[in-house]
């Protein structure tokens, strides 16, 4: 009799222990499932609701002025457009409200009032000294001038590409270019650049290092000069530092938030001759209208097609920066 009672009690205790183990196991499994579900839910919520901090940004190059991170909304609702035009345009139009009129026309194309900025420059040469492109999309209008064709080409090469630059101390050091993507960019009110290539003994090749007059002149009285010399050879450089700044730059690739629209001329400027320049005909365009109203009307009409061949950027160009990425 006592044996049966002891057996019953033992079975009862074992059942309680087993049930307790099962309950704890089920609890642990449920906790794991619940925590995993919550973790996945939070992660998905963050990905679908948070701002885009670079996942879909098409350009990895950067500049020294940061804009807000882009979102997944329509570009025309959150983007800014800068239109750079010569003084000649506003002089010819001669209407104090022409910008307001164009803003209303851009509104019909999906660009809200206040998202389009009109920026005037006096001449291509002056614009070359300090180009500053601050908007998400930048359209630079250049009136074709046969006498300024080379200046226009150099400016287009500068603003249609990204450049990583360092300052140069030409009084202390010799410099050499490491490859085709390496150029020297000079900017200022007057840049005359002379170079003297050196041999391995630092003696001048065809020039005297102590006689500046014997140096080869590669730019004269320019406001913007992109200098290319023979790679792998040290050069002694001479220029007037009071009126010109020289930088050692490397071309990184196309700056896809900038487009150049050439006004007039028989052909679109070709900057693809440089082997480091990717074909950029899509962002080099030409319109042949004699009147500036007609030019701006055409731009308004095709603005959305134009920006489709461009890419929005998170940073801007500011050539005034000392250590900068332009």
UniProtKB/Swiss-Prot annotation:
Residues 165-167 are annotated as: CNP motif. Keywords: Calcium, Capsid protein, Disulfide bond, Glycoprotein, Host endoplasmic reticulum, Host-virus interaction, Metal-binding, Outer capsid protein, Signal, T=13 icosahedral capsid protein, Virion. One of its GO terms (molecular function) is metal ion binding. Residues 253-255 are annotated as: GPR motif. Glycans are attached at residues 69, 238. Residues 1-50 form the signal peptide. N-glycosylated. The N-terminus is blocked possibly by pyroglutamic acid. Disulfide bonds join 82-135, 165-249, 191-244, 196-207. It is found in: Virion; Host endoplasmic reticulum lumen. GO terms for cellular component: host cell endoplasmic reticulum lumen; T=13 icosahedral viral capsid; viral outer capsid. Its main location: virion. Ca(2+) 1 binds at residues 95, 206, 214, 216. Ca(2+) 2 binds at residues 177, 228-229, 231, 301. Some rotavirus strains are neuraminidase-sensitive and require sialic acid to attach to the cell surface. Some rotavirus strains are integrin-dependent. Some rotavirus strains depend on ganglioside for their entry into the host cell. Hsp70 also seems to be involved in the entry of some strains. In group A rotaviruses, VP7 defines the G serotype. Homotrimer; disulfide-linked. 2 Ca(2+) ions bound at each subunit interface in the trimer hold the trimer together. Interacts with the intermediate capsid protein VP6. Interacts with the outer capsid protein VP5*. Calcium-binding protein that interacts with rotavirus cell receptors once the initial attachment by VP4 has been achieved. Rotavirus attachment and entry into the host cell probably involves multiple sequential contacts between the outer capsid proteins VP4 and VP7, and the cell receptors. Following entry into the host cell, low intracellular or intravesicular Ca(2+) concentration probably causes the calcium-stabilized VP7 trimers to dissociate from the virion. This step is probably necessary for the membrane-disrupting entry step and the release of VP4, which is locked onto the virion by VP7. Belongs to the rotavirus VP7 family. This is Outer capsid glycoprotein VP7.
